UniProtKB/Swiss-Prot annotation:
It comes from the Bacteria. Belongs to the RNA methyltransferase RlmH family. One of its GO terms (molecular function) is rRNA (pseudouridine-N3-)-methyltransferase activity. HAMAP family: 23SrRNA_methyltr_H. This is Ribosomal RNA large subunit methyltransferase H. The keyword Nucleotide-binding does not apply. Homodimer. It catalyses: pseudouridine(1915) in 23S rRNA + S-adenosyl-L-methionine = N(3)-methylpseudouridine(1915) in 23S rRNA + S-adenosyl-L-homocysteine + H(+). Keywords: Cytoplasm, Methyltransferase, rRNA processing, S-adenosyl-L-methionine, Transferase. Its EC number is 2.1.1.177. S-adenosyl-L-methionine binds at G103. It comes from Gemmatimonas aurantiaca (strain DSM 14586 / JCM 11422 / NBRC 100505 / T-27).
Length: 154
């Protein structure tokens, strides 16, 4: 099983970028991890809807063809860390690749939601997309430690 993490843009804040790289590196010890950074739409004179649509087109174009697509979206299902680890383990046992998609500053466009096999809420709050990326990377790492019975998860 391969895990892809599709995100809009690169982290702008140095401290957050360091934390993201750290957790993505840790997660890669448990799952073959492909981080795919898609160009952010410069939306200075565009509506949020247009920005979402253009970014969604780019994200969908980069999705692995054979992956179970999970849209990270506040309206999705919630799982605690143990449930998330079990779900990932089920995907691994079924030899399914998984692609998690995190939208940009304006969220995910309809094209991503339509392509998604499921929607996952990372929190009931609105998160900056860089923070959502860090949370997703940390949860991938945590899920790996749960599955292996390592002491990180308490």
């Amino acid at each position: 099983m391969r895990v892809a993490l599709l995100v809009i843009g690169r982290p702008r804040h140095a401290g957050l970028a360091d934390a993201i790289r750290d957790y993505e590196g840790r997660a890669a010890h448990y799952w073959p991890l492909d981080v795919i950074e898609v160009k952010e739409e410069p939306g200075r004179n565009l509506s949020a809807d247009v920005v979402r649509e253009r970014e969604a087109e780019r994200l969908v174009a980069r999705l692995p063809a054979d992956a179970v697509v999970v849209a990270c979206d506040p309206g999705g299902v919630t799982m605690d860390s143990a449930q998330f680890a079990r779900w990932l383990q089920e995907q691994r046992e079924s030899a399914r690749n998984v692609a998690f998609v995190i939208g940009g500053a304006h969220g995910l466009g309809p094209a991503v939601r339509e392509r998604a096999n499921r929607r996952l809420s990372l929190a009931p709050w609105t998160l900056p997309h860089e923070v959502a990326r860090m949370v997703m990377a940390e949860q991938l790492y945590r899920a790996g430690t749960i599955i292996r019975g390592e002491p990180y998860h308490k």
